[in-house]
Amino acid sequence: MPAETVRKEVALEYCRRVNAGELEGVLQLFAPDALLVDPLGTEPVVGRAALAARLAPALRGAVHEEPGRPYAAHDGTSVVLPATVTVGAPGAPPQRRGRTRVMGVIEVGEDGLIREMRVMWGVTDSSWTARPAPDEERRKELAREHCLRINDGDVDGLLKLYSPRIRFEDPVGSWTRTGLEALRAHATMAVGSNVRETAGLTVAGQDGRHAAVTVSATMDYLPSGPLLARHHLMTLPAPADPHRALIGIEYVMVIGVDADGLIDEMRAYWGATDVSLLDPAA
C-alpha cells in the first residue's frame, strides 16, 4: 500500500501535469483501467482512452488547478484533494473563464497509479452553473452544522442530524460503526476531549446525496491521545505535559444524506500525516 506521503504527492502531481497541459503525462498517472467520475452523480468514464477524450477539451481550454492541502486516510489507498479549478472554452478570452471549487476523492493502487478519482462539486460551487439549488445548500449546511454542534458540546442536538441507520468511519480505514448509540459514544468522547472544529471549504455532489467539508480540529491530548496512539492512528511522540498538550487534526468529512434529510453516512478522511501536536500557548 502506498504511504500517505506518496498518495498526497500523486494528487499534487496530477494538478502540476494538468496545469502544464501534459495530456500524456496526466494519463500516465492513471491505471490502464482507471475510473473517473466528474462530477459525482454523472456517468463514470473508464480507461485511459476515455480519460483522454474527457480531459483533452479542458487542457485545450488552459485549465488551471490550484490545489489545497491534501488529506490522507488509514485505508492505505485514499487521498482527498480540494482545489479551485479555472477553465475556459478553447480559444475563449480570459474574462470568460469559469471558476469551480472541487474536492477530489482519489484511490491510489500499490503501483502508485490512480485507480479511481471521484470529483465532488455542485452547481452551487461553480461560476459556470451557479443557480439556486436548495438541496445542495441543505447538504452543505448539514456538514457545517455537525461542526457547530460538536463545538457546543450538544451531543443530543448532533444526533438529531443523523439517521438511525447511520454508518460512519472516523477515520476512513479504521472500522465502520453503525447506529445512533455508537455515534453517541463517539461524539461523547470528542466533546469530552474539548474538540473545537472550524469548517472550511464545503462542496456538494450532483448525485442528490453527498457533501464534503474540510475541517481544522483541535482537541485535548487527554483522554483521546493515548487511545489514538494505541490504535496506530497517530504516530506523534508523547508530549512533555500531556495535561496541557493539544492535538491538531486536519480532515475532510464526507456525508451522505437520505430522503428524510438526515445523515446516514459519514466518512472522515485523515491520516497520521494530518495529525500534529500543538503549542497550547500559541
Curated annotation (Swiss-Prot):
Record keywords, A-Z: Antibiotic biosynthesis, Isomerase, Plasmid
Pfam families on file: SnoaL_2
Residues reported in the UniProt entry to bind substrate: Y14, E65, H146, R177, E197, Y251
Record site feature (Raises pKa of active site Asp-170), residues: H186
GO biological process, one term: antibiotic biosynthetic process
Region (Lsd19A): 1-133
Phenotype reported upon loss of the gene: Cells lacking this gene do not produce lasalocid, they only produce iso-lasalocid.
SUPFAM superfamilies: NTF2-like
Region (Lsd19B): 134-282
Superkingdom assignment: Bacteria
Enzyme class, UniProt record, top EC level: isomerase
Recorded consequence of changing E197A: Retains the 5-exo epoxide-opening activity but loses the 6-endo epoxide-opening activity. Loss of both epoxide-opening activities
Function of the protein: Epoxide hydrolase responsible for the double epoxide-opening cyclization of bisepoxyprelasalocid A to form lasalocid A, a polyether antibiotic. In vitro, accepts various substrate analogs differing in the left segment of lasalocid and epoxide stereochemistry to afford products with excellent regioselectivity.
Protein name in the entry: Epoxide hydrolase LasB
Lineage: Bacteria, Bacillati, Actinomycetota, Actinomycetes, Kitasatosporales
